[in-house]
Amino acid sequence: MEELTAFVSKSFDQKVKEKKEAITYREVLESGPLRGAKEPTGCTEAGRDDRSSPAVRAAGGGGGGGGGGGGGGGGGGVGGGGAGGGAGGGRSPVRELDMGAAERSREPGSPRLTEVSPELKDRKEDAKGMEDEGQTKIKQRRSRTNFTLEQLNELERLFDETHYPDAFMREELSQRLGLSEARVQVWFQNRRAKCRKQENQLHKGVLIGAASQFEACRVAPYVNVGALRMPFQQDSHCNVTPLSFQVQAQLQLDSAVAHAHHHLHPHLAAHAPYMMFPAPPFGLPLATLAADSASAASVVAAAAAAKTTSKNSSIADLRLKAKKHAAALGL
């Protein structure tokens, strides 16, 4: 009987103690997330203190004591220990901290460890751009081909035959001369360009030579403009001693053309003297222009002297004819 009374009192005291420890452990669990949110660095220490707190040890010991005692008090101890263990396993401060960190990492404004900073991206792009520029600057230099005299003679001979050889002719010529087909093709391209340049220069030279035949006639519109504007007027002051047969023929032809244009288009009559002769070509040396101007001045002086001589001779002829006529009439 005394043993039963002692056992009941002991189990009652143990039950009251377990209730107090359970209340204390519940308060610790509820205050854990708040402390973790305010003090992130101290959460792990709080979790360690909670794990090593007497409430946790009491919950484990209560479970063991309830299982060993068996009875009403023991059952209560087991239930308290199980509840304490379940609460501790479901709402651990460490797990709450981990969940809070995971939720904060999902927020759009929070920096992530996996994201690359923009500065690092810019540095990588700059480094890549510098590498690309270095590769473009370092280019392979073209090797210049030096043709022998025999190769040049063969190429020129084929170029005289045709300016555009086909692939078979280029291949045969490259095998015969020991050159690559690409070299032969490039040589023909350069040779055609050179030929076109020579033809253009020759054409320009022909035009300049044809224009130089009438260098002395370029001053005619400015010397005797009235004669060119009125080609069919036979006044004595409009007659100019011809410098040469070619100049006279050219002036007559231009006068006829100007007269025809005057009837067709009256507004072109004023511009006729300036449209008859081509303009002097550009790009001539200064020495050539000076020589041309000197020759033109000498031609003008000779024309003026010839005109004066012709006037004097015509006056003398008229006087001689007048004397003869007077003698014939008996005056």
Swiss-Prot record:
It is found in: Nucleus. Residues 93-109, 118-136 have a biased composition (Basic and acidic residues). Keywords: Developmental protein, DNA-binding, Homeobox, Nucleus. A motif (OAR) lies at residues 313-326. The keyword Phosphoprotein does not apply. GO terms for cellular component: chromatin; nucleus. Residues 140-199 bind DNA. Gene3D superfamilies: Homeodomain-like (1.10.10.60). One of its GO terms (molecular function) is DNA-binding transcription factor activity, RNA polymerase II-specific. It comes from the Eukaryota. One of its GO terms (biological process) is cartilage development involved in endochondral bone morphogenesis. Expressed in heart, skeletal muscle, liver, lung, bone marrow fibroblast, pancreas and placenta. SMART domains: HOX. Residues 59-91 have a biased composition (Gly residues). InterPro entries: HD, Homeobox_CS, Homeodomain-like_sf, HTH_motif, OAR_dom, Paired_homeobox_Bicoid. Residues 27-140 are annotated as: Disordered. PANTHER family: SHORT STATURE HOMEOBOX (PTHR46255), SHORT STATURE HOMEOBOX PROTEIN 2 (PTHR46255:SF1). May be a growth regulator and have a role in specifying neural systems involved in processing somatosensory information, as well as in face and body structure formation. Belongs to the paired homeobox family. Bicoid subfamily. This is Short stature homeobox protein 2. It comes from Homo sapiens.
